[in-house]
Amino acid sequence: MLQFLLGFTLGNVVGMYLAQNYDIPNLAKKLEEIKKDLDAKKKPPSA
């Protein structure tokens, strides 16, 4: 579990670093879509 969290955190940091240094709009959009998908999966549908 700890290893997963470390890898996940490291991945996020590297991703943010790359996004800041290389302005790639498509990649940013893709990351936002993935983030929204993860958030949707985390929360049970309240409808």
Swiss-Prot record:
Record's keyword terms, sorted: Immunity, Innate immunity, Membrane, Mitochondrion, Mitochondrion inner membrane, Mitochondrion outer membrane, Transmembrane, Transmembrane helix
Protein name per its UniProtKB record: Short transmembrane mitochondrial protein 1
Induction line: Down-regulated by bacterial lipopolysaccharide (LPS) in monocytes and dendritic cells.
Tissue expression remark: Expressed in monocytes and dendritic cells.
Record organism: Homo sapiens
Membrane-traversing stretches: 7-23
Quaternary structure and interacting proteins, as annotated: Interacts with components of the ubiquinol-cytochrome c oxidoreductase (cytochrome b-c1 complex, complex III, CIII), such as UQCRC1/QCR1, UQCRC2/QCR2 and UQCR10/QCR9. Interacts with components of the cytochrome c oxidase (mitochondrial respiratory chain complex IV) complex, such as MT-CO2.
Pfam families: DUF4535 (PF15054)
Family that this chain belongs to: Belongs to the STMP1 family.
